[in-house]
Amino acid sequence: VKSDNTANATIDDNSNVGTKGIGVLNAEIHKVDNKLTNTEWWESFVKKRDPNFNIKVMRNDFKTILYPHDSSSQVGEPYCMAASMYPFLLYRIEKLGGKSAVPKNLDSFCGIYVNLNFALASEIKGAVATPEFLMYMDYFCRKEWGNNYYLKPSVRITTDYCIKQKTIGSQIDQYFQQVTYSINQIAGARGMQSPFTNFSFFDKYFFEGMFGEFVFPDGTKPEWNSTNWLQRRYLHWLNQERLKCILTFPVCSYACLTDKEGNFKDLDTFHFICNEYAQGNSFFTYLSRSVDSLSSCCRLQNAVQENTFNTTNGQIGIMTGSKNVITLNLNRIIQDWQHTWSDYKDHIDVNTNKCCFPVDWITHKDFQEGIKKYIENILERVYLYQYAYNDLMHWCKDHHLYAAYDAGFINLDKQYLTIGINGLNQAAEYLGMECNNNIYYKTFCRLIFSTIKEQNKKHKTKTAQFNTEQVPAESASVKLYNRDKADGYWVPTDTNLYASYIFKPNDTHISILDKIILHSSEFAADELDGGSACHLNLSEHLSQKQYEYLLKFMAKVGCKYATFNIPNCECEECHFIAKQPFSKCPKCGSTHVSL
């Protein structure tokens, strides 16, 4: 209960919580009860689906081979969403509760948007994305200063009577500041945690493919030139603002169209992105060869079901996300599979406690079929659990418990039931493989991913669709590791958690190009239809030319989703921030610094 032990609570590390006051405590103290209630409701819908199913099997699965994400949240809460903002223009946020007016100018738009973001976040477990935010902001900028406002950012918009003079550009920056700092504030409806917020950015061809048929309520259409100027200004502004304050949100994703040769269709945007990376900016780049999917979160890629515009409610392809996430503990599953053999102990190295198969064993069809069938049997239960959770959510929706869905911000049937993967590296290591660019590891990865994707397609219904992702698993990766270690399973000794990447993040012998290949279509990208972010950790920033080479290489090999991580450093005395590590503050000389 002490206020200084926030880090020991069950709070997301990315939630901007620094101390635990009574508001945080009130949310945390009920999590055990929430989990029990959530489990009881979930189990009741499983029994409705299959009255003969032994519910003890589900309970055991969730204690061993499966991990239900955020199970201590409220009953029936969706996991994450990418919401349409169109109902925002038609009905304001009154349908979500409270009183408000329809935004009529840029000032009211930015103010009510913050309320919208907090209201949407209060109904879900995880992230809320508003991919259209900057396009809508541009709409109100044009209503304020004309369609060519972006050509005259230095024009003064205040009179001589004003003490502080403002230009179009400085006023826009002020609205950037208002929105950005607001979404980084704590939210009472989320246990005093910030709403996990995501913004999307688009190149010219992705923008036209996504919003080509879009029409605002007044009959006007989005403008690429002004929106492009605005989104670039915001991304550049955010990079500079992060030198003043460590801003967690928004998580930014830039969507670009490429061809199969690895060429970016919008070269101007390509050069801009690489220049921003070279200046130390931090965001994800999403590469696609068609406008058939959208990345709206730090972890998810979701197929766009129908990219046509509905003038009645504004529905368009950006509405997506996950309803629920259940992650497979692959390391334990693979060891359990081997334990089904009567002579499995004969294949265990007594020194390492790892499997001692010949290095080429994975290429044998009988082994592949054995793993495939074992995973399929587990997946049958996973789909039962996911169907049941989907039934629970539809029950909640039928009883009008989801204000955001009733108001048209999101469509329940367009979201996914996600099957996560964790412990991939460790499963491969247990079987004697090296997690690098080799034929055996590639065969293993494709076997796992293709098996799940094949079953996802088989189990799709009109109201339930599935995808697969290599989950970040911030807390799950530690919990699964500790659980397996305590139960006597083999776990690695060089780390105390299960990796979230296809490569081993602590492997210093694997090159950056091989890391990209491991997240390419050759290994996984085509099978992981729910996404797998390739986090490329660098010790220092690269040049624009170097980033251009790497992004072209990603596009060529089919690495769809990546970002570059270089540690920022902050002085704990004067709060000077730099986009590279330092041991001594260059401003005040203090050695009390934090990465």
Question: Regions from the language model: what does each represent?
Answer:
Residues 2-413, 434, 438-594:
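Conserved catalytic cores of very large enzyme subunits
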Residues 135, 417-430, 450:
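Contiguous, well-ordered alpha-helical segments that form the cores/surfaces of helical PPI scaffolds
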